[in-house]
C-alpha cells in the first residue's frame, strides 16, 4: 500500500490533484481544505496517503497531516459514512474542530458537511464522542460545559451567552469554547453580557 507521496503538482481537478512522482502521475482525491492549501502546478509537495482498494478500482486519498488521515479512517467506522462523506466533513472542519464538535455534541457543526443530515450527525456524535479526544486534544472543561448546557444544568448566564453567540452565527462548539475561555478570565459569577463581550473578543483572535 502507498502511505506517502512526494512529488510535483501537475494539475488539479474538482476534487483531486495529479501529483507527478518521477514521471508517474498519481490522481489523489483530497478534501477541499487540503486542495486549497496545496501549492500551484509546478511546485513540490507531499501528502499522507490512504489507499482504498475495491473490486472495480483502486483510489488514493491524500492528506496534509497524519491527523487528517486518522480522522478519515475513524469517520468511516460509522454506518452511513463513506469516503465522500468523510472528505466532506474534513472539508468543512479541521481535525481539531471536528474533535471538539463531536466531543461537545455539536450536531449542528457536524451537519454542515455535504451529505450529513441531522440523523447522521447525531449518529456520528453518539458513536465517536468517547473516541474523539484520543484523536485530538479536547479541553475537559469545555466538554463538561457542553454537557451542562445540554442537560440544562449550566448557570443561566452561561447558557444565555452561548445562545447569543450561536444566534450571531457561530457554531455551537466555537461558542461554547469562547464562553469557557471567558469564564476562566471573568469568573463563575460573571453576567451574560460580560461573557458575551469576552467571548466575542476570544472569537476575534
Curated annotation (Swiss-Prot):
Homotetramer. Forms an RuvA(8)-RuvB(12)-Holliday junction (HJ) complex. HJ DNA is sandwiched between 2 RuvA tetramers; dsDNA enters through RuvA and exits via RuvB. An RuvB hexamer assembles on each DNA strand where it exits the tetramer. Each RuvB hexamer is contacted by two RuvA subunits (via domain III) on 2 adjacent RuvB subunits; this complex drives branch migration. In the full resolvosome a probable DNA-RuvA(4)-RuvB(12)-RuvC(2) complex forms which resolves the HJ. Pfam families: HHH_5, RuvA_C, RuvA_N. GO terms for molecular function: ATP binding; four-way junction DNA binding; four-way junction helicase activity. Disulfide bonds: none annotated. Gene3D superfamilies: 5' to 3' exonuclease, C-terminal subdomain (1.10.150.20), DNA helicase RuvA subunit, C-terminal domain (1.10.8.10), Nucleic acid-binding proteins (2.40.50.140). The RuvA-RuvB-RuvC complex processes Holliday junction (HJ) DNA during genetic recombination and DNA repair, while the RuvA-RuvB complex plays an important role in the rescue of blocked DNA replication forks via replication fork reversal (RFR). RuvA specifically binds to HJ cruciform DNA, conferring on it an open structure. The RuvB hexamer acts as an ATP-dependent pump, pulling dsDNA into and through the RuvAB complex. HJ branch migration allows RuvC to scan DNA until it finds its consensus sequence, where it cleaves and resolves the cruciform DNA. Residues 153-205 are annotated as: Domain III. Belongs to the RuvA family. Keywords: Cytoplasm, DNA damage, DNA recombination, DNA repair, DNA-binding. GO terms for cellular component: cytoplasm; Holliday junction helicase complex; Holliday junction resolvase complex. One of its GO terms (biological process) is DNA repair. This is Holliday junction branch migration complex subunit RuvA. Its main location: cytoplasm. Residues 144-152 are annotated as: Flexible linker. Residues 1-64 are annotated as: Domain I. Residues 65-143 are annotated as: Domain II. Has three domains with a flexible linker between the domains II and III and assumes an 'L' shape. Domain III is highly mobile and contacts RuvB. InterPro entries: DNA_helicase_Holl-junc_RuvA_I, NA-bd_OB-fold, RuvA, RuvA_2-like, RuvA_C, RuvA_C_sf. It is found in: Cytoplasm.
Amino acid at each position: 500500500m502507498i502511505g506517502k507521496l512526494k512529488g510535483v503538482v501537475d494539475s488539479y481537478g474538482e476534487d483531486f490533484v495529479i501529483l507527478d512522482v518521477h514521471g508517474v502521475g498519481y490522481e489523489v482525491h483530497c478534501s477541499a481544505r487540503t486542495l486549497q492549501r496545496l501549492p500551484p502546478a509546478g511546485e513540490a509537495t507531499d501528502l499522507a496517503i490512504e489507499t482504498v482498494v475495491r473490486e472495480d478500482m483502486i483510489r488514493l486519498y491524500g492528506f496534509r497531516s497524519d491527523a487528517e488521515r486518522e480522522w478519515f479512517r475513524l469517520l468511516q467506522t460509522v454506518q452511513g459514512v463513506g469516503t465522500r462523506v468523510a472528505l466532506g466533513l474534513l472539508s468543512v472542519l479541521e481535525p481539531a474542530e471536528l474533535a471538539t464538535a463531536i466531543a461537545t455534541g455539536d450536531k449542528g457543526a457536524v451537519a454542515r458537511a455535504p451529505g450529513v443530515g441531522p440523523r447522521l450527525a447525531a449518529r456520528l456524535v453518539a458513536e465517536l464522542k468517547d473516541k474523539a479526544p484520543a484523536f485530538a486534544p479536547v479541553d475537559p472543561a469545555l466538554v463538561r460545559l457542553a454537557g451542562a448546557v445540554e442537560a440544562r444544568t449550566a448557570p443561566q448566564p452561561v447558557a444565555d451567552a452561548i445562545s447569543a453567540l450561536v444566534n450571531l452565527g457561530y457554531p455551537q462548539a466555537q461558542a461554547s469554547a469562547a464562553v469557557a475561555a471567558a469564564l476562566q478570565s471573568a469568573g463563575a459569577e460573571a453576567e451574560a453580557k460580560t461573557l458575551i463581550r469576552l467571548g466575542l473578543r476570544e472569537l476575534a483572535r
